[in-house]
UniProtKB/Swiss-Prot annotation:
Domain POLO box as annotated: residue spans: 464-542, 563-646
Reported modifications of this chain: Phosphorylated in an ATM-dependent manner following DNA damage. Phosphorylated as cells enter mitosis and dephosphorylated as cells exit mitosis.
UniProt KW Kinase keyword: yes
Induction (free text): By the intense activity associated with seizures.
Distribution of this protein across tissues and organs: Constitutively expressed in post-mitotic neurons.
Listed GO biological process terms: apoptotic process; cytoplasmic microtubule organization; DNA damage response; G1/S transition of mitotic cell cycle; Golgi disassembly; mitotic G1/S transition checkpoint signaling; mitotic spindle organization; negative regulation of apoptotic process
Source species: Rattus norvegicus
PANTHER family assigned: SERINE/THREONINE-PROTEIN KINASE PLK (PTHR24345), SERINE_THREONINE-PROTEIN KINASE PLK3 (PTHR24345:SF42)
SUPFAM superfamilies noted in UniProt: Polo-box domain (SSF82615), Protein kinase-like (PK-like) (SSF56112)
Biased composition (Pro residues): 20-31
Entry protein name: Serine/threonine-protein kinase PLK3
Function as written in the Swiss-Prot or TrEMBL entry: Serine/threonine-protein kinase involved in cell cycle regulation, response to stress and Golgi disassembly. Polo-like kinases act by binding and phosphorylating proteins that are already phosphorylated on a specific motif recognized by the POLO box domains. Phosphorylates ATF2, BCL2L1, CDC25A, CDC25C, CHEK2, HIF1A, JUN, p53/TP53, p73/TP73, PTEN, TOP2A and VRK1. Involved in cell cycle regulation: required for entry into S phase and cytokinesis. Phosphorylates BCL2L1, leading to regulate the G2 checkpoint and progression to cytokinesis during mitosis.
Amino acid sequence: MEPAAGFLSPRPFPRAAAPSSPPAGPGPPASASPRSEPGVLAGPQTPDASRLITDPRSGRTYIKGRLLGKGGFARCYEATDTETSIAYAVKVIPQSRVAKPHQREKIINEIELHRDLQHRHIVRFSHHFEDADNIYIFLELCSRKSLAHIWKARHTLLEPEVRYYLRQILSGLKYLHQRGILHRDLKLGNFFITDNMELKVGDFGLAARLEPPEQRKKTICGTPNYVAPEVLLRQGHGPEADVWSLGCVMYTLLCGSPPFETADLKETYRCIKQVHYTLPASLSLPARQLLAAILRASPRDRPSIEQILRHDFFTKGYTPDRLPVSSCVTVPDLTPPNPARSLFAKVTKSLFGRRKSKNKNHSEEQDNVSCLVSGLMRTSIGHPDVRPEAPAASALAPVSLVETAAEDSSPRGTLASSGDGFEEGLTVTTVVESALCALRNCVAFMPPAEQNPAPLAQPEPLVWVSKWVDYSNKFGFGYQLSSRRVAVLFNDGTHMALSANRKTVHYNPTSTKHFSFSVGSVPRALQPQLGILRYFASYMEQHLMKGGDLPSVEEVEVPAPPLLLQWVKTDQALLMLFSDGTVQVNFYGDHTKLILSGWEPLLVTFVARNRSACTYLASHLRQLGCSPDLRQRLRYALRLLRDRSPA
């Protein structure tokens, strides 16, 4: 589409009369989606006049849609050309905000710098015009908003995700610097995400031409948390300042907050000038090394864009070709396509657990239950009076939780575990990485303390494992939830549960396939599993006591209880991973328990030796610290999760 107007005039031109009727053509009605195809419209419609934007020179009309964002000078809306149905992001700047010459000059500068940029990772400039009320800048629409929105939903990202986004930022930034343009406001909110998850650098409101050092402007500009020390010291803004901002972006995505962020702006600026920040030990060594290289006080000491791309963080770490859309709100399952990793996974499964049968009779595409289960392994439970051995946990001697040296920090001696469990839906890797990111962010920044902060007065009801039995040498792992639902994760990876009232059986051959039966109508092929499930339920009811004094949860409040995806036993604790992201760690020696749940926000529930339970916001623990008892268990849980991570 050709620009509808030339350059901005030095002064607003007279108000143009709005057309008496919308232009001919299939313009979408006010209630239509801005991206509606012309062919599906019933014919010319008359949109609400207040939503129309008309180019005074060409007469072309646009329908203003949803608000995409707003800043100090402008608001950004989705806008659709009524003739072509092409959707744009339009930046609307009131004339009243650019009444002074220097204000108007900034807008002219932004347009002049942006209009000729053509790069895959730069937001595309389309055209602009103005009327008596506003200036309109039409840009490429990035439908998934910005990296700031993803960060707010996720708080921290995985290192492969950070590499994925940084590579695109670096590509766009390299293009800008080669054309002699400094962005000067690199931050999460200025990295926009398209429908197919590509990143585009945008918002050139503070951009400037690169000048020789002696001619650079000394003004302080940018966003406080991302401003380089030389800018604060009024030494001018060069390419190295953009690199500094990029380092702050990388740190924020990996650690959950900007490196120099404080509650006071003066203190933030002091930390920036002194380069005073903390590198969490939970980050990988290449990530820490790259951040330390970028965030250096002297611009001359910082790496160039080419040097950053050659760093081990990028060359030796996995970068996905594309991120799933779901990663905007939840941790993605990122498994590198590595033959060695696949071989290792097969060996691990052969040692620690059997996967469910994949013979053709067990096809997940068949909807008929009898066909679905016809190929299941038939398991005989023997004589009904045969009792399973006592739970393995009860036979273990108390163990110490004294921390070991860093080089021996991974939990050793896994006694037993399940396999990968379900192969579809929310995976073990997803749960592990999500918990790992959240927990390491909490532990890494936690200050020393002698006692726990105040717990939540009325936490939401929590579904947790109150009893468990490990009989995986024959059948599987049985457990009872606090809602009184009893379930078994069988050795073949299937899952069966009995409702709290013992009237309904829930069967999951995979995490995305679910069948419910009344107890009296369970198919014959599933009767062996039901017999085992009932026996587990009876054993736990008669021989085991509830593992803590958390409030009971009525099953009606939990219509879809979490499924156990995987369990792992070490010499000190039992780790359980659930399909809703809940992580529970039971410590054998003193019967304490740690439960991570919620995620938005993350909740940490600690069941102490005396069976009393308290729930804390992870953000409070991060800010205020916690007792040595809880800290040790959080660190052990972190090591357990790290040991399960494929990274």
